[in-house]
Amino acid sequence: MTYEPVSLATALASFSQVWSPRIVTTVNDYDVRVAKVEGEHLWHVHDDTDEFFLVLAGELHIALREEAGERTVRLPRGSVFTVPRGTEHKPYAPVPTEILLLEPTGTSTVGDRHEEVPDHVDATTGHALG
């Protein structure tokens, strides 16, 4: 990894796949990833880590299954949200959306436990830019 400025717009323009994040940089032992998303992801859980979302463009909804029941958070452009570790969640983008994620290096996009992975979701720990 080189330590040079990275344009998020350029990074996002470098790929077209949805639900297939690219690693733009690392901070300590965390990846900073960008992704294009649209439609549904899948229900999944990260047992040992929180998951941070920043909506750069579009709108992201995250369905959550919590002790008190199910709820959905709506994140318009410019919003952030952290899904706590151990919380089952399912992201959904009703329109083409661009997001930034912060999670420990090596964290799978489908978590530690998940339902069947649909063809349009890339089960990965992130791809290098370029």
Residue ranges and their predicted role:
Residues 8-43, 49:
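A short glycine-rich, His/Asp/Glu-containing loop-to-beta-strand
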Residues 28, 56-57, 76-77, 95:
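A cytosolic small-molecule/anion-sensing beta-strand core signal
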Residues 2-12, 25, 94-130:
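Double-stranded beta-helix
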Residues 36-37, 46-66, 102:
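Short, conserved beta-strand element in jelly-roll/cupin
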Residues 31, 40, 52, 59-61, ...:
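Structural motif
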Residues 66-85:
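Short acidic-glycine-tyrosine-enriched beta hairpin
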Residues 43-45, 50-55, 72-73, 90-91:
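His/acidic/aromatic-lined binding-pocket segments of jelly-roll/cupin-type domains
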Residues 42, 79-90, 97-99, 107:
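Histidine-centered metal-chelating micro-motifs
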